[in-house]
Amino acid sequence: MSGVDQIVKTFADLAEDDREAAMRAFSRMMRRGTEPVRRIPAAKKKVNGFMGFRSYYSPLFSQLPQKERSPFMTILWQHDPFHNEWDFMCSVYSSIRTYLEQEKVTLQLWIHYAVGHLGVIIRDNYMASFGWNLVRFPNGTHDLERTALPLVQHNLQPMNGLCLLTKCLESGLPLANPHSVIAKLSDPSYDMIWFNKRPHRQQGHAVQTDESEVGVSAMFPRNHTVAAEVDGIINLPLSHWIQQGEFGTESGYSAQFETLLDSILENGHASSNDPYNMALAIDVPMMGFNGGA
């Protein structure tokens, strides 16, 4: 007797109540088998600084075809002095992207609120601020021409991902339920101070200088006592901050240093009457582009 015949015979020999119970069991099994398989969505690609830069500034060339627009965006990026800021901004976005997309916050909207807190030039002022002109030739092609070389200043800005999110929320970032995002960025692994200067290494979205003594020497006079205190704080391990609590609250630092640090943490820069050079100036390289036809 075949397997099918055996099943039919067994089913026929069942009492009526047992037969109905078996039918219900078979029906449930069939429904489970026909349900669509739930696919786990693939992890989305991390957004890097150039992707964010291109997304934000590309509308500057909206009147041009894509084949002309892309090379111009590459040229602007190569000579943009805010690579660290863009990497940081987009790395924070990547780490909370799932939460933001649930509330319809796109990359463009995130950047709109974030750029102002990192000193990045807004889109409408970008070309004029960096001396760029879009030139149109008689044959209809275009090129970029640079007519001015501005001096770009980077202020010392202690900041982490949670700080950037908080500033964006305060300036109007539309998140109906920000608590889950705040919890994500409150994890100790994200709680490193980010300094706006090169060279750097990137851990998650927190950027920390490799050679703190180089950065400190650019801000303070040689052998100044405050410089030694800042350098000591920069090199403290993450575990120290988790144990100690808020940044710079330990006892033993000079009143001069604590006053300076309070000004930086509250305002993003030193007070106007502070004698130290808190602006790290970087010259934008001189470059001309004229591929005339």
From Swiss-Prot:
The entry's keywords: DNA-binding, Nucleus, Transcription, Transcription regulation
InterPro entries: MATalpha_HMGbox (IPR006856)
Pfam families per record: MATalpha_HMGbox
An individual GO BP term: positive regulation of mating-type specific transcription, DNA-templated
DNA-binding region positions on the chain: 42-97
GO cellular component: nucleus
Predominant subcellular localization, coarse grouping: nucleus
Family: Belongs to the MATALPHA1 family.
Function, as annotated: Mating type proteins are sequence specific DNA-binding proteins that act as master switches in yeast differentiation by controlling gene expression in a cell type-specific fashion. Transcriptional activator that induces the transcription of A-specific genes like mating factor ccg-4. Required for mating as an A-cell and for blocking of heterokaryon formation (vegetative incompatibility).
Name recorded for this polypeptide: Mating-type protein A-1
